[in-house]
């Protein structure tokens, strides 16, 4: 039976004359395998479900709206629709993309935010595809107008030590997918891919 996860709002009450804290959990809404979320304003979260849906939830009244999209994702193993980030009316989403039958990539797409339908376009695609259905990553973080993304090693172990391949790395790119000129340069590593910020990781999701 498919597991249903609950989105829970943590409300922290700060007593005015005491250092003690009371915690109260409020059930806001139910989702099917939620994976990523990002605030689009003070009252609404946009949420990905691993199974492929993108939804907006109002945290005040619990109302949920589904948003159509054009992503050709694959819900398989640990893969599916993964993380999502909102900034300046744009959305970035990581997902499991089918490159050819039984071969998958961790890919990242960007689209202009729209409440009814979002048209995404890829800005990153993993360069070493695999038939593995595990360890896709993938957490997205925007900082100082750079997009950081963790790419899982797909169960490949030592592939994460290869600076010419994306699995097992963190990439750092501009918000449009281009590669920053100030990305780190590594001595004695002339073939280190310019978008790779760090190697040697397993399946970072935090």
Question: Across the structure, where does each feature detected by a protein language model lie?
Answer:
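Sec-dependent N-terminal signal peptides
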Residues: 4-15
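Repeat-solenoid scaffold signature
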Residues: 192-206
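Beta-propeller blade signature
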Residues: 105-115, 163-176
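Secondary-structure boundary elements
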Residues: 116, 142-148, 173-185
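Acidic, Gly/Ser/Thr-rich repeat motifs that build Ca2+-stabilized beta-propeller blades
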Residues: 19-158, 206
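Blade/loop signatures of beta-propeller domains
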Residues: 18-23, 178-189
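Short, well-ordered junction/capping motifs at the entry into regular secondary structure
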Residues: 155, 187-193
């Amino acid at each position: 039976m498919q597991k249903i996860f609950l989105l829970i709002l943590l409300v922290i009450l700060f007593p005015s004359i005491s250092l003690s804290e009371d915690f109260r959990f409020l059930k806001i809404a139910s989702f099917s395998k939620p994976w990523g979320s990002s605030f689009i304003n003070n009252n609404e979260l946009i949420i990905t479900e691993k199974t492929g849906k993108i939804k907006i939830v109002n945290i005040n009244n619990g109302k949920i709206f589904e948003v159509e999209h054009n992503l050709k994702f694959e819900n398989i193993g640990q893969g599916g629709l993964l993380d999502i980030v909102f900034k300046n009316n744009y959305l970035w989403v990581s997902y499991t993309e089918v490159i050819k039958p039984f071969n998958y990539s961790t890919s990242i797409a960007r689209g202009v935010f729209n409440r009814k339908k979002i048209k995404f376009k890829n800005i990153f695609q993993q360069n070493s595809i695999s038939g593995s259905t595990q360890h896709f990553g993938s957490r997205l973080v925007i900082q100082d107008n750079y997009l950081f993304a963790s790419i899982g090693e797909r169960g490949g172990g030592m592939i994460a030590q290869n600076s010419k391949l994306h699995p097992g790395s963190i990439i750092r790119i501009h918000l449009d997918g281009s590669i920053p000129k100030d990305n780190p340069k590594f001595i004695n590593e002339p073939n280190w891919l310019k978008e790779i910020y760090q190697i040697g990781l397993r399946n970072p999701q935090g």
